C-alpha cells in the first residue's frame, strides 16, 4: 500500500470534492456563524467585562470545552500526529501533563486572580509587584509570542492540511478562515468565542474518533500497531545510518534521561514549568476560567478540559503512528530527495501523517467532515488568540497610553486590534511557506522552553512568597530573557543536522535537551528574583493583600455563597463534587501513565 502511494504528490490538487463534502463544509460554516451570532446577541458586549470576560457568567461545560478547543489548534493536530509518526507515544505526555496544572489553575491560581479583580495576567503582576515596566514587558512578550508562534503555527498547519487535502489555493483558504473567525470574534467578544469553541470541540472529537476507528480497522489493534510500527521502514534509506529505523522505545512514555528524544526527567520537571506558564499564566487560557460565574464552575471547567486532554493519545498520536505504518515511504522518508517529492521538505515528512490518513482512509462525505474538523481546530485556536491578544493590548497597553479612555474607546480599540492581527497574520504567510514544516512542533516547544520559564518563576514566587518584590521580579525576567534568547539564537544559527550528517552544534544544544534547559532557566530566574528581593526592601503589606496564597481573603468575590442557607449548602455540595472528580481524574491519569510507561 505504501509503494502504491509513494509516487503521489501531496502538493498536487487533492481528490475532487463530492457534493456531500461541499455540503458538510458549507453546513459547518453556516452553523458556526449562527452560533457566533446567537452568542453575540445573548451576551452583554457593551461593557469591558461583558466583552472581554463574558460578563463573568460562564458555566463549567462551555469553559471546559473552550479550554480544550483553545489548546487543540490545527498545529497540534498536525504536530502531535507528526511527532507520533516520528517518535511514538511519548509526545502524548504534553497533553496528559495538562491534568495537574489545570487543577492547579482552578484550585490555586484562579482564586487569587479573582480576589485581585484583574482582567489580564500582566495586570495581576502589576498589582502584585507594583510599577509598570513588568506589566508592559509581559504584555508585549505575550503579543509577540501570539503572533509569531501561536498564530503562525496554527495558520501554517491548518492551511497546509486544507491545501494538501483539497488542493485549495493556500492564500485563499487561509484568508477565508481568518476573515470568518475574526468576524464573530470582533462582534461577540469572549462569549462568542467560548460558545463556538464548545461547538467546535464536539466536531473535533466526533471527526477524530471516526478517523481513529477507521485507522485501527486497517491495522488491527494496539498490539498489531506496536508490532507493525517497529517495521515501518521506508524502502529507500541512507546507508550506514539508523535514522530510518523507528525508535526502540516508541511504545513507552518514560524514556532515558540522556539518550531519549523526550527524556522522562524533562517531561516531568521541564514540562511542568512550561505547562504552568501556558495553563496558569497565559492570557488565552486563564481568560476562560476568569469568565466563570463562580469558583465551582471554574473548577468544573478545568476537570472537563483535563478529561478531554486524555483523548489526543488515541485521536492524534496513535493515528499518526498508523499513518507511518501504512505509508512508510511518504511519512517515514529519510532520503532528502524522497522527502522533497513527498511533502516539499527535505528534512522529513512526518507532519503529513494526519492529512495523508484522511485522504487515503476517509470516504466521500466523511472527508468533508475532517476538513471541517481541521477548520474547527484552526478557528478555535485563532478566536482564542485574537480575543486574548485584543484584551492584552487594550487593557495593558492602550489604557497605559490613554488612561482617560472610556469604555466605548476601549471596545473600539479591542476590535481594531483584531483587524491588525489579521493583517500581520496574512503578511506572515509567505514566511510560513518558506519555513521547515518538519520543525513546527519542535520550534514551538523550543521557543516556549527559552522564554516561558522566567515568567513562570515570577508568577509562582509572586503567589507563594510574600517577600518577592518588583526589583527582584524585573531582574529575574531580564536575566532569564537574556539567557533564553541566547539559546534561541544558537538554535536558529545551528539547526539540527539532517540524517547522515555529524552533529557539530555547540555543546549547549547538543547535550542539553530543551526540556532540561527549561528547568535550569527556571531555577536561574527564580534565584535572581530571590537574591535581588532579599537585597532590597520588601513589599508593603497592603501591596500583597489578596494577591498571594497566604494573604488571600477568604471572603473573596468569587461568587461563593456564605452562610447556612440552601444556596450555601448547594455551593458546598458542588465543591465536594469537584474535589472528588479531581481525585478521580488524577487516578485515571496515573493509571494511563503507568500502563504506557
Curated annotation (Swiss-Prot):
**Glycosylation (residues):** 5
The name this protein carries in UniProt is: Sodium/mannose cotransporter SLC5A10
Any matching Pfam family: SSF
Looking at the UniProt entry, the stretches that span the membrane are 17-37, 74-94, 101-121, 151-171, 175-195, 202-222, 266-286, 302-322, 368-388, 411-431, 445-465, 473-493, 515-535, 577-597
| Ranges per topology, Cytoplasmic | 38-73, 122-150, 196-201, 287-301, 389-410, 466-472, 536-576
Q: Where in the cell is it found?
A: Apical cell membrane
What is the purpose of this protein? Electrogenic Na+-coupled sugar symporter that actively transports D-mannose or D-fructose at the plasma membrane, with a Na+ to sugar coupling ratio of 1:1. Transporter activity is driven by a transmembrane Na+ electrochemical gradient set by the Na+/K+ pump. Exclusively recognizes sugar substrates having a pyranose ring with an axial hydroxyl group on carbon 2. Has likely evolved to enable renal reabsorption of D-mannose, an important constituent of oligosaccharide chains of glycoproteins.
Taxonomic superkingdom = Eukaryota
GO MF term (any one): fructose:sodium symporter activity
